[in-house]
Amino acid sequence: MTDRSQCTQSGRTMGAQSASQDLQSLDSWLTDRIVTITVGPEEKRWVVHEKLLVSQSDFFRNYFSEGHDEMKLPDDEPRLFALFIRWLYGTAFLPSGGTRNFRFLPPDGVSVSVRDYLGVYVLGGKFGIVGVRNAVLDVLYAYYGEGSGADEHRSPDMHDITYIFEHTTPDAPMRRFLVAHALFYLFSRGRRGAPLPLDWEQVLGRSAEVGYEMIRMLGEWNWVMGANAPRMTIKARTEFHERAPLPEPEVVKQEADDEADASPI
Protein backbone atom coordinates (compact mmCIF):
# COMPACT_ATOMS: atom_id res chain seq x y z
CA MET A 1 0.00 0.00 0.00
CA THR A 2 2.82 2.33 0.89
CA ASP A 3 4.75 1.47 -2.29
CA ARG A 4 1.71 2.16 -4.44
CA SER A 5 1.13 5.47 -2.69
CA GLN A 6 4.76 6.44 -3.19
CA CYS A 7 4.60 5.53 -6.91
CA THR A 8 1.44 7.57 -7.33
CA GLN A 9 2.98 10.53 -5.54
CA SER A 10 6.15 10.20 -7.66
CA GLY A 11 4.11 10.19 -10.85
CA ARG A 12 2.22 13.28 -9.75
CA THR A 13 5.48 15.04 -8.92
CA MET A 14 7.00 14.21 -12.31
CA GLY A 15 3.82 15.35 -14.05
CA ALA A 16 3.84 18.60 -12.14
CA GLN A 17 7.49 19.18 -13.00
CA SER A 18 6.80 18.52 -16.68
CA ALA A 19 3.83 20.90 -16.65
CA SER A 20 5.95 23.55 -14.94
CA GLN A 21 8.66 23.17 -17.59
CA ASP A 22 6.05 23.45 -20.35
CA LEU A 23 4.71 26.68 -18.85
CA GLN A 24 8.22 28.08 -18.56
CA SER A 25 8.84 27.30 -22.23
CA LEU A 26 5.58 28.95 -23.23
CA ASP A 27 6.37 32.01 -21.14
CA SER A 28 9.73 32.25 -22.89
CA TRP A 29 8.24 31.87 -26.38
CA LEU A 30 5.16 34.02 -25.93
CA THR A 31 6.75 37.00 -24.20
CA ASP A 32 9.61 37.35 -26.66
CA ARG A 33 9.87 39.57 -29.73
CA ILE A 34 7.10 39.53 -32.33
CA VAL A 35 8.01 39.43 -36.02
CA THR A 36 5.90 39.86 -39.15
CA ILE A 37 5.78 37.48 -42.10
CA THR A 38 3.97 38.44 -45.30
CA VAL A 39 3.03 35.63 -47.64
CA GLY A 40 2.00 35.51 -51.28
CA PRO A 41 1.69 38.26 -53.89
CA GLU A 42 -1.20 39.71 -51.88
CA GLU A 43 1.17 39.99 -48.87
CA LYS A 44 -1.10 38.45 -46.27
CA ARG A 45 0.39 39.24 -42.87
CA TRP A 46 1.10 37.02 -39.88
CA VAL A 47 2.58 38.19 -36.60
CA VAL A 48 4.53 35.36 -35.01
CA HIS A 49 6.54 34.91 -31.82
CA GLU A 50 10.11 34.97 -33.04
CA LYS A 51 11.58 32.57 -30.49
CA LEU A 52 8.95 29.93 -31.24
CA LEU A 53 9.55 30.29 -34.97
CA VAL A 54 13.35 30.14 -34.87
CA SER A 55 13.33 27.24 -32.39
CA GLN A 56 12.12 25.07 -35.26
CA SER A 57 14.04 26.34 -38.26
CA ASP A 58 17.48 27.53 -39.33
CA PHE A 59 15.75 29.11 -42.33
CA PHE A 60 14.01 31.60 -40.03
CA ARG A 61 16.78 31.74 -37.44
CA ASN A 62 19.41 32.83 -39.94
CA TYR A 63 17.17 35.57 -41.31
CA PHE A 64 15.89 37.08 -38.07
CA SER A 65 19.27 36.83 -36.33
CA GLU A 66 20.35 39.70 -38.58
CA GLY A 67 17.89 42.00 -36.82
CA HIS A 68 15.05 41.97 -39.36
CA ASP A 69 11.51 42.52 -38.09
CA GLU A 70 9.71 41.39 -41.23
CA MET A 71 10.15 38.61 -43.78
CA LYS A 72 8.48 38.42 -47.18
CA LEU A 73 7.59 35.09 -48.80
CA PRO A 74 6.01 36.25 -52.09
CA ASP A 75 6.21 32.85 -53.80
CA ASP A 76 4.39 30.88 -51.11
CA GLU A 77 0.64 30.35 -50.68
CA PRO A 78 -1.07 31.96 -47.66
CA ARG A 79 -3.42 28.95 -47.42
CA LEU A 80 -0.47 26.61 -46.90
CA PHE A 81 1.36 28.97 -44.55
CA ALA A 82 -1.79 29.14 -42.41
CA LEU A 83 -1.67 25.36 -42.00
CA PHE A 84 1.99 25.60 -41.05
CA ILE A 85 1.20 28.23 -38.40
CA ARG A 86 -1.58 25.99 -37.06
CA TRP A 87 1.01 23.24 -36.61
CA LEU A 88 3.61 25.59 -35.10
CA TYR A 89 1.35 26.85 -32.32
CA GLY A 90 -0.48 23.53 -31.98
CA THR A 91 2.74 21.74 -31.08
CA ALA A 92 3.81 24.55 -28.74
CA PHE A 93 0.70 24.18 -26.58
CA LEU A 94 0.85 20.38 -26.24
CA PRO A 95 2.57 19.11 -23.08
CA SER A 96 6.03 17.67 -23.60
CA GLY A 97 6.49 14.03 -22.67
CA GLY A 98 2.79 13.29 -23.05
CA THR A 99 1.12 10.68 -25.23
CA ARG A 100 -0.64 13.23 -27.41
CA ASN A 101 0.81 14.75 -30.55
CA PHE A 102 -0.55 17.52 -32.71
CA ARG A 103 -2.73 16.11 -35.48
CA PHE A 104 -3.93 17.85 -38.61
CA LEU A 105 -7.61 17.33 -39.47
CA PRO A 106 -8.23 14.70 -42.18
CA PRO A 107 -8.51 16.14 -45.71
CA ASP A 108 -12.14 16.56 -46.75
CA GLY A 109 -11.57 18.12 -50.17
CA VAL A 110 -13.41 21.28 -49.13
CA SER A 111 -11.77 23.03 -46.19
CA VAL A 112 -8.48 21.23 -46.78
CA SER A 113 -7.33 18.85 -49.50
CA VAL A 114 -4.60 16.25 -49.94
CA ARG A 115 -2.81 18.70 -52.23
CA ASP A 116 -2.92 21.34 -49.49
CA TYR A 117 -1.15 18.99 -47.11
CA LEU A 118 1.39 18.01 -49.76
CA GLY A 119 2.04 21.72 -50.22
CA VAL A 120 2.71 22.04 -46.49
CA TYR A 121 5.10 19.07 -46.79
CA VAL A 122 7.01 20.93 -49.50
CA LEU A 123 6.93 24.11 -47.40
CA GLY A 124 8.43 22.15 -44.51
CA GLY A 125 11.28 21.20 -46.81
CA LYS A 126 11.89 24.83 -47.71
CA PHE A 127 11.92 25.84 -44.04
CA GLY A 128 13.97 22.78 -43.03
CA ILE A 129 11.37 21.63 -40.48
CA VAL A 130 11.09 17.87 -40.09
CA GLY A 131 8.24 18.03 -37.57
CA VAL A 132 5.65 19.55 -39.89
CA ARG A 133 6.57 17.10 -42.67
CA ASN A 134 6.05 14.21 -40.28
CA ALA A 135 2.70 15.66 -39.19
CA VAL A 136 1.60 15.76 -42.85
CA LEU A 137 2.73 12.17 -43.31
CA ASP A 138 0.72 11.15 -40.24
CA VAL A 139 -2.56 12.64 -41.45
CA LEU A 140 -2.17 11.12 -44.93
CA TYR A 141 -1.17 7.78 -43.45
CA ALA A 142 -4.51 7.65 -41.65
CA TYR A 143 -6.35 8.92 -44.74
CA TYR A 144 -5.04 6.25 -47.13
CA GLY A 145 -5.00 3.37 -44.63
CA GLU A 146 -2.58 0.47 -44.29
CA GLY A 147 -3.41 -1.25 -47.57
CA SER A 148 -3.97 -4.68 -46.05
CA GLY A 149 -5.60 -6.30 -49.07
CA ALA A 150 -9.06 -4.80 -48.74
CA ASP A 151 -11.46 -4.96 -51.67
CA GLU A 152 -11.21 -1.22 -52.12
CA HIS A 153 -8.09 0.88 -51.75
CA ARG A 154 -7.96 4.66 -51.98
CA SER A 155 -5.48 5.74 -54.62
CA PRO A 156 -3.49 8.97 -54.53
CA ASP A 157 -4.19 11.24 -57.48
CA MET A 158 -1.36 10.83 -59.96
CA HIS A 159 -1.15 14.61 -60.33
CA ASP A 160 -0.43 14.81 -56.59
CA ILE A 161 2.35 12.25 -56.99
CA THR A 162 3.82 14.29 -59.85
CA TYR A 163 3.65 17.42 -57.68
CA ILE A 164 5.68 15.71 -54.95
CA PHE A 165 8.23 14.38 -57.46
CA GLU A 166 8.67 17.88 -58.89
CA HIS A 167 9.10 19.59 -55.51
CA THR A 168 11.10 17.15 -53.39
CA THR A 169 14.46 15.41 -53.54
CA PRO A 170 14.60 11.72 -54.55
CA ASP A 171 15.10 10.58 -50.95
CA ALA A 172 11.87 12.19 -49.67
CA PRO A 173 9.83 9.51 -47.84
CA MET A 174 6.58 10.99 -49.18
CA ARG A 175 7.54 9.81 -52.67
CA ARG A 176 7.77 6.18 -51.58
CA PHE A 177 4.63 6.49 -49.48
CA LEU A 178 2.46 7.75 -52.35
CA VAL A 179 3.90 5.34 -54.93
CA ALA A 180 3.28 2.40 -52.60
CA HIS A 181 -0.37 3.41 -52.18
CA ALA A 182 -0.78 3.78 -55.94
CA LEU A 183 0.52 0.23 -56.40
CA PHE A 184 -1.71 -1.12 -53.64
CA TYR A 185 -4.65 0.41 -55.49
CA LEU A 186 -3.46 -1.12 -58.77
CA PHE A 187 -3.55 -4.62 -57.26
CA SER A 188 -6.63 -4.21 -55.05
CA ARG A 189 -9.44 -6.70 -55.60
CA GLY A 190 -11.97 -3.94 -56.16
CA ARG A 191 -10.07 -2.60 -59.18
CA ARG A 192 -9.74 -5.98 -60.92
CA GLY A 193 -10.96 -5.76 -64.51
CA ALA A 194 -11.55 -2.00 -64.36
CA PRO A 195 -9.64 0.48 -66.54
CA LEU A 196 -7.05 2.69 -64.93
CA PRO A 197 -8.23 6.16 -63.90
CA LEU A 198 -7.71 8.97 -66.40
CA ASP A 199 -5.12 10.68 -64.22
CA TRP A 200 -2.89 7.60 -64.50
CA GLU A 201 -2.87 7.86 -68.28
CA GLN A 202 -2.28 11.61 -68.16
CA VAL A 203 0.68 11.38 -65.77
CA LEU A 204 2.36 8.12 -66.74
CA GLY A 205 2.22 9.08 -70.41
CA ARG A 206 4.53 12.03 -69.78
CA SER A 207 6.39 11.34 -66.51
CA ALA A 208 9.06 8.70 -66.92
CA GLU A 209 10.32 9.32 -63.39
CA VAL A 210 7.04 8.36 -61.70
CA GLY A 211 6.64 5.30 -63.92
CA TYR A 212 10.20 4.20 -63.26
CA GLU A 213 9.76 4.51 -59.51
CA MET A 214 6.63 2.34 -59.64
CA ILE A 215 8.43 -0.37 -61.64
CA ARG A 216 11.48 -0.19 -59.36
CA MET A 217 9.31 -0.66 -56.29
CA LEU A 218 7.52 -3.62 -57.88
CA GLY A 219 10.90 -5.22 -58.53
CA GLU A 220 11.78 -4.87 -54.86
CA TRP A 221 8.69 -6.85 -53.85
CA ASN A 222 10.23 -10.03 -55.35
CA TRP A 223 6.97 -11.57 -56.52
CA VAL A 224 7.18 -14.83 -58.52
CA MET A 225 4.94 -15.47 -61.54
CA GLY A 226 2.41 -18.19 -60.74
CA ALA A 227 2.88 -17.93 -56.99
CA ASN A 228 0.33 -16.40 -54.67
CA ALA A 229 1.13 -12.83 -53.77
CA PRO A 230 1.75 -12.55 -50.02
CA ARG A 231 -0.41 -10.41 -47.80
CA MET A 232 1.17 -6.98 -47.79
CA THR A 233 0.73 -3.84 -45.74
CA ILE A 234 2.28 -0.41 -45.72
CA LYS A 235 5.08 -0.06 -43.18
CA ALA A 236 4.36 1.73 -39.91
CA ARG A 237 3.99 5.49 -40.32
CA THR A 238 7.14 6.12 -38.32
CA GLU A 239 9.11 4.35 -41.06
CA PHE A 240 8.31 7.35 -43.27
CA HIS A 241 9.30 9.92 -40.65
CA GLU A 242 12.42 12.02 -41.09
CA ARG A 243 14.60 12.13 -38.01
CA ALA A 244 17.57 14.26 -39.02
CA PRO A 245 17.55 17.99 -39.79
CA LEU A 246 16.69 18.63 -43.41
CA PRO A 247 19.48 19.92 -45.66
CA GLU A 248 19.50 23.48 -46.91
CA PRO A 249 16.96 23.95 -49.73
CA GLU A 250 18.45 23.27 -53.15
CA VAL A 251 17.35 22.77 -56.71
CA VAL A 252 15.32 19.56 -56.76
CA LYS A 253 16.86 16.84 -58.90
CA GLN A 254 14.42 15.49 -61.47
CA GLU A 255 16.17 12.25 -62.34
CA ALA A 256 15.52 9.05 -60.36
CA ASP A 257 17.99 8.23 -57.61
CA ASP A 258 19.34 4.68 -57.68
CA GLU A 259 20.27 5.04 -54.02
CA ALA A 260 16.76 5.87 -52.77
CA ASP A 261 15.47 4.08 -49.68
CA ALA A 262 14.22 0.50 -49.85
CA SER A 263 10.64 -0.59 -50.47
CA PRO A 264 8.17 0.89 -47.96
CA ILE A 265 6.20 -2.31 -47.45
Segments the model singles out, each with a brief description of its role:
Residues 55-70, 93-95:
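Cytochrome P450 catalytic domain signature, combining two hallmark sequence patches
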